Each structure stands twice: as structure tokens, then as C-alpha cells.
Regions:
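Carbohydrate-binding surfaces of carbohydrate-active enzymes
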Residues: 1-156, 164-168
Length: 169
């Protein structure tokens, strides 16, 4: 990744800042570069699940997929067992007719990050009112770990902190 070592606190192409703190984009790139991954995309009549194996070994995986509302209710759950050859991909379709304004498709399997069909068009979704609460706050070296819990899907949480910008005198 070029420009990974920017020293200025700005939004750019970098994924790691001057202090070696991972920016938000780091985690998206980490998932994109994973050697085994699940991808799920909404399509006509349901969703298309893609299983990618970029390793030299074949594997068998139980893929769990379906629809979940933003309140956590699930529908149309399915499990499909796939044997995936080395350096290959497989796709399969799941037929689900649910409202994508109130939920999303998901796919998960052991050894994979969970994939979902959520996209960045948040204004198109109807999210329930969040009851997010801070559950625990603990110091870990120079880091402050904050655990937040909610009973419904909460896409955004804003934490007010003291000014942590770097000042050059």
C-alpha cells in the first residue's frame, strides 16, 4: 500500500498513521486480502454467496446464511456444505424475499469473517432506535478500551473524548 507511513493526521490513502495506529480502512483491506473469504451480495430473488479459497489446500466448510433484521431476528436460515478446491471460488444462490430496508443477508462459517450485504447507503435503511450503553471502560497501556452493548443493530456510535490531536510547538 503506498503512502502507508504518512506523518500528517489527515485522511488520505494511508491505512496506518505515523504512530502505527490502524485507520478504519486497515480492517477493510485486511478482509479484502484474506486468503479465505465469504462474500454475499443481494441479487434478484435473494442473494449470491461467493466462497473464495486462495490457499494451496482444499477445504470443506459449512456455510450458514440467511436474512437478519436490525433487531436480530433471523429468517430463511440455510446451511450448505461446500468442498472448495485450492485457488478457486464457488458461488451459490439463496432464495430469500425479505425487506432489505429493515435487515440484511449474511453468511458465516468457521474460520471466516462473517459477510453481510450491508452497503454504505445508510440513508436507505430503517434502523430501530438504539439502546446502546457503555458496559465497561478499561485502560490497556496507552489505549482506552470501551465496551458498548446494544440489543439492536447500531451502525454508528460517537464517543466524545478529550482532544487527542498532535500539537507541534
Amino acid at each position: 500500500i503506498w503512502m502507508y507511513n504518512y506523518c500528517w493526521p489527515e485522511t488520505g490513502w494511508t491505512i496506518i498513521d505515523y504512530y502505527l495506529t490502524r485507520k478504519i480502512s486497515f480492517y477493510f483491506l485486511k478482509r479484502a486480502f484474506a486468503t479465505k473469504k465469504l462474500i454475499i451480495r443481494a441479487c434478484e430473488g435473494g442473494a449470491e454467496v461467493t466462497v473464495i479459497n486462495e490457499t494451496p489446500e482444499a477445504f470443506t466448510a459449512d456455510i450458514h446464511c440467511g436474512y437478519m433484521t436490525f433487531t436480530g431476528e433471523t429468517d430463511s436460515l440455510r446451511t450448505k456444505t461446500l468442498k472448495v478446491a485450492p485457488h478457486s471460488m464457488q458461488q451459490f444462490h439463496i432464495s430469500v424475499c425479505n425487506d432489505l430496508k429493515h435487515g440484511f443477508f449474511f453468511a458465516s462459517a468457521e474460520g471466516f469473517d462473517t459477510a453481510d450485504s450491508l452497503r454504505a447507503y445508510y440513508r436507505d435503511y430503517v434502523f430501530p432506535e438504539s439502546d446502546a450503553k457503555i458496559e465497561k471502560v478499561e485502560q490497556d497501556g496507552n489505549d482506552l478500551l470501551v465496551t458498548i452493548r446494544a440489543s439492536v443493530y447500531t451502525p454508528f456510535a460517537y464517543l466524545m473524548t478529550s482532544d487527542d490531536r498532535v500539537h507541534y510547538d
